[in-house]
Amino acid sequence: MDLGLALGAGGARNISFGHNMTTLNYTLSRGIGKALFPGDEILITQLDHEANRGPWLSLREEGVVVREVALLPDGTLDYDDLRTKINENTRLVAMGFSSNALGTVNEVGLVRELTHKVGAWLLVDAVHYAPHFPIDVNALGVDFLLCSAYKFYGTHIGVLYSRDGLLDRIPVYTLRTQEQHAPYCIETGTLNHAAIAGVKAAVEYISTFGTGETLRARIVSGMERIGEYEHILGREIYRGLKGIKGVEVVGPDFGKGKRVPTVSFTMEGMDPIDVCTLLDRRGICAWDGHFYAVRPIEVLGLLEKGGVTRVGVSLYNTADEVQRLLEAVTDIAEGKLRKE
């Protein structure tokens, strides 16, 4: 299976499909929850999308202790807080690879070391990371990784990677007629076979941007090439917005390590939804609010203010489009583009 190659997995046996990432994660959490006892602990973060918070928070009803790793004001996780909260009772750490709201890329390698040191599992939500960087699940050493194919030019279908033999040990809910082993045991009902075929096409499309003797090599180099291009455009947006009076960029600087090309900002005296409406007049697509990452927007004190305005780039965007965006935001800030 091409997707197994794309993620660096051992093969098709490690890849399960679902209607979306949220559904897969909820199904997985129900199974893991059946194997836990009152007093067992799960760690989540204040930076995550609700799809990687809600399924685990609901296990509190079963007596599972769910703790949050704190979010710092600069949009990064407090890893000292994580070190304080992870302990011998921790059974699972669920975290995002990158933030769809702030653009932050988390230190998965560090968290893996801390997680496996106490014998816990590490689950990573890579939905917002997968479109921008190559992934090697074996090198990462994660136990579970989830993503969504529509984010990397594919169809709307959820994907779950599980480490060899791990899914077979989890009592997920299955039908009598269902295959009782990985990868099928978590795949409920008839899958969208057309969407699965679309995933294969998306992976092959990405590989056309790369070079190498094998498909895996072409996928990796293709994603690296895409990521480098996107980084240049994203950095230009970040720096350009920082230079506009009345604009406050939310999230880590592009000069502080790896970052996805997603940039969120607020404008003095304006609601984010109004900023999006004005940008739309210039043919620019932006989104406002929390993007289902409610908790980080709430922690940063922005939820009651309508959240943030979010823009981002992909491989099909251009430097000219970035300049159009910056010119439009400048006009909004200077009152040249305003509500009628």
Identify the role of each PLM range:
Residues 1-340:
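Pyridoxal 5′-phosphate
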